[in-house]
Amino acid sequence: MASKFFAILSRLKYINRWALMRNTHNENLSEHTLDTAYIAQALVIIDKNHFGGKLNPEHAAVLAMYHDVSEILTGDMPTPVKYFNADLKKAYKAAEKSASEKLINHLPDDMKIEIGGYIDPVCDDEYMPFIKAADRLSAIIKCIEERKTGNREFIAAEETQMKAIKEMNLPAANVFIEEFLPAYSLSLDELN
């Protein structure tokens, strides 16, 4: 039987993020995933070049590509709901785990271990701070883009995400914030 795995993954583009917020531009999971992958790779490169890190930037990028794929089956749960209380957070984590397992089971047997390891990365704990930071930086970038259009809806979200990323104490994220984040506030003409 033909595998449904990549057909299911292609549906990332139909899942919009920030469901409780008024958006001037809807961001889908596919867009967010690509941004997160770029940023995760950059964070690991920064860590290698500035702080002597030993992780593989490409591995970080691929982990980031798969970091939200379970949401194809669970949907993108708004953050205030996802973290409303410990019981809800635990239940959502269990739903994500179950969705990840279901996705992995759609892979042919000869691909389950390699690709499944990206979907449910049990052995990549040292990469997770970089993936989480990239995820938060992608959210901050979305907030900046919305703020640039005059949408005040994302100001508090930007502050919350920035506070959370600072609390991670990930030096590479601080370098990214200083070196790359300011450019996201520029217009197209200013970028050229």
List each model region and its residues.
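Alpha-helical, largely C-terminal catalytic domains
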Residues: 1-192
